[in-house]
Amino acid sequence: NNLYPICSDFERDFPSVCFALATGVGKTRLMGAFVAYLHLAKGIKNFFVLAPNLTIYNKLIEDFSNPNHPKYVFKGIGEFAQNQPRMITGDNYLQTSQMTLFHSEVNINVFNISKINAETRSGVEPRIKRLSEYLGESYFNYLSNLDDLVLLMDESHHYRADRGMQ
């Protein structure tokens, strides 16, 4: 048993894992594999993928949502061929209602920290934290109250700055 120690305690109330991998080795594909595994093995259906800038944000949306894209992260995963995950982005989440969220087996939220930070610079509360008439609460609060939300951060070293912590 000493050859393969088992982790029994985390510094937080939730497990936190970090992968420091070189450019081009497939970090986005690894995120897709995490989503597939956590859904199929553990029944988790809510994921939040955070991008540090607009370029990576657009790339993540394409890689997670377009089965015809060469870098589609769920290629070969039969369970997602018939029931593709619902893609909720920083551009379309305001049109999302709780009813539509319950109809999807897997919800993948992709947001861009730069867009959220731009709103805080003007002294205004970010839209994600404002009341949504569709949900009856802010989308931020809705996400915060999900018991099974998994946060995936691409280029996570960008988020420790003061504005990212807000």
Report each predicted region and the residues it spans.
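RecA-like P-loop NTPase motor core of helicase/translocase proteins
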Residues: 1-166
